Amino acid sequence: MWKNIYIDNQETNYSISDTGEVKNNKTNKILKQQIQNGYCHCTLSVKPKPKRCRVHRLVAQAFLENPENKEFVNHKDGNRQNNNVDNLE
């Protein structure tokens, strides 16, 4: 399942899957992800300048409810590269 990515409440040309893939909606290509400090990142071309995003946060923002406005996203299995929505809380 795919959902649009919003940055600062603005819709972007990107989508995030419930498994943690990021897609450019204009080209339909999956973005390559980099790993830093154990977390998967990708860079989105948004104005006024590109934004580097942690993939687990994009998944959580799109697929998880956060009624208490919790600041952190936890990987249930401790694997920071497992960004499946079922592994996040």
Predicted regions and their residues:
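Conserved recognition-core residues within compact binding domains
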Residues: 1-73, 77-89
